[in-house]
Structures are given as C-alpha cells and as structure tokens.
Amino acid sequence: MIKEVQQNDIEKCVTVIRESFKTVADEFGLTVENASRFTAFATTKERLEWHLFGEHRPMYAYYYDGIIVGYYSLLLQDNNECELNNLCVVPAYRHKGIGEELLKDAFEMAYKLNCNKVNIGIVEENKVLRKWYEGFGFVHTGTQKFDFFPFTCGYMEIWLKKR
C-alpha cells in the first residue's frame, strides 16, 4: 500500500533511502569519501523534513505488512514538469513489483499535480536501471559530469499522456 509520507515517517524513510541506495554505492565503488553528496550518504532527517515542509514536495512510502520498504518524492518544477526523486525499494523487497507500483503511482500523482512531463536523474553507468526506466517509456536526454561525483549523471524524461 502506498501512502503519503507524514512527519513521523521521515526517519524510517531516511533509513529506506540510505539502505536502498547503498547497493548502488557498493556496486559502483561510491563511498562517503569520494561521493559524499550521493543519496546513500547525503540523505538525512533534516533534508527530508526540508523537502516536505520547506519545498512542499509530495512524498510517498510503500508499506508492506505495515513497514515502509519503498519511497519516492516529486519536486514540482516550472512549465508543468516534475522531477522524480529517490524512487527506491530496500533490497530484501526487490523483485516483487514494488518499484513498478511506486513508479506508476508517481505517474498518477504527477498527472494529478498537472505535470505534463516527469524528469529523472540516474547514475549513467547503471545500465540496468536505465534499461528499467526505458521499459516504462523514459527517454534518455543527456549526461553531465560533476567534480563532486566519480560517476556521470544521466538524465531521462517521459511525457505523460493526456487522459
């Protein structure tokens, strides 16, 4: 079941995000020393509270048997676009369709928020993840290299269909 995140969910969401993105960090050799701004290391209670209360981001958690095992948020952008952030599922609950449910829910929520397009950023070198998003209709739009990351940031987008 997917529910909107409340303040009392924040700490658990931080744990879910950090645990989920840690597998990516491990796979690509990312550490707090070489990629301190990477999601697995940079997500904090204060940051998520700012997202929720400062930026008013819609944030959602996936509950499985009463515990949070997945998460995503939407950052509303100009021109009726939004950015999908931190869509994740903890490793023990992967390959059960939860990620797909979260993504489809994100599309639904973005549409309800009058977004015409959803943008995402990924670790470009993560070919499996890129292919997964492409399977849902995302199109690769470019890359950018930042000095503070040892990987390349890849960008993708999907236009939402009118209903």
What are these regions (language model features)?
Residues R94:
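Glycine-rich ATP-binding loop(s) of histidine-kinase-like ATPases
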Residues E4-N86, V90-P91, L103-D105, M109, ...:
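Acetyl-CoA-dependent GNAT
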Residues E100:
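Residues forming the Rossmann-fold NAD(P)(H) cofactor-binding site
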Residues N116-R130, E134-F136, T143-R163:
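C-terminal "cap" of GNAT-fold acetyltransferases
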Residues G97:
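Conserved G/P- and acidic residue-centered "switch" motifs that form tight phosphate/ATP-binding loops
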